[in-house]
Each structure stands twice: as C-alpha cells, then as structure tokens.
Amino acid sequence: DRQYRKRSCDVQMTVILASTSPTRQLLLTNAGVSFATARPDVDENRLRSANPQWRPDDVAPALAQAKALAVSGLRPDALVLGADQTLICDHRIYAKPLDVADARKQLAALRGRSHTLHSALCCARNGSVVWRHDARAELTMRDWSPAFLDQYIAKLGGDILTTVGGYKVEELG
C-alpha cells in the first residue's frame, strides 16, 4: 500500500480576474478564490473586425486569451484569468445588446429556438498562456408572450445590456 501525504505549498500567487463583470467575480468568490480585478484594455469589436476569418467557435477563446494576455503584460507576477462568452444561433454571433431595443430584438430572435452559449477561459502568466478551456452549452429558449418580455425587461433593467443575448441564465433565465 502506498501512502499519500498532503503537501502544503508556501508559494503565494496573486490571481487577477481580467474582468470587472459582477457575475464572473461572484463565480470566483463562491469558489473560494482570492483575487483582484483589472479591466483589460481590449477592444473586442476591433479584434473581431481585424479577424474576419474567425469562425463563431473561434471568438470566445480568442477574446479570453486577448484579455488574459493584456493584463498579464502589466502584471507578469500574477496568474491572470481572462474569460469570454458568445451566443451563437444559426451561425450568427450575438453580442451584448447596444440598448433595450436591441435586447428586445435579440430576445425575440431567440424565442422558441435553440442556440449555443460558448464560454472560454484562459490563464496567462509572464505574458504567456499557461492554461485554457472552453465549453459549449446547448439551450432552447421557451416560447413567451410579448407581455412576458415586457416584464422580463423591466425586472432585469440595465443588466439586460451586460450579457450576450440579453438574458442571464444564472439569474432570471
């Protein structure tokens, strides 16, 4: 019989979340991770425009990496976590809504339809990628009435503009 001993590690590493997203911060907090936050200097729209060859599945991993590397360049001593999520329906990538009218339009386009949420994570240290992961979730939005949509938008308020597709699966749905 082999005996295993737990080893303690005295190495302390600063973890930085390359995002100011309250949802991402809550996920790390709930996981018991001590971290700081930094807003990455990444223009997502410019990156997308500069890379027309990107397929829908390329976008979230590329943006997560860009965010992690941008902050890692400023804090090479830290482990930097970059994240991104895209919503894909019928080969179209949905971005965060520009305004409430755009959110209403996006939600109407998803009504009663299946779509994919593609989430990507990237860790960087010393300006290099040390780990990455991405996953997809297939979801179907239920059919709903115009009155329901009005109530939903009223309940979410400004939060409707902070997430792709205009909905938060981790909250109201």
Annotate the PLM regions.
Residues 1-4:
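Intrinsic-disorder-associated, low-complexity terminal segments enriched in Asp/Asn/His/Tyr and depleted
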Residues 13-16, 29, 53-173:
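Anionic-ligand binding patches
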Residues 22, 42, 128:
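Short, glycine/serine-rich, charged loops/turns that create anion-binding
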Residues 45-48, 85-87:
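Short, basic/glycine-rich phosphate-binding loops at helix/coil junctions
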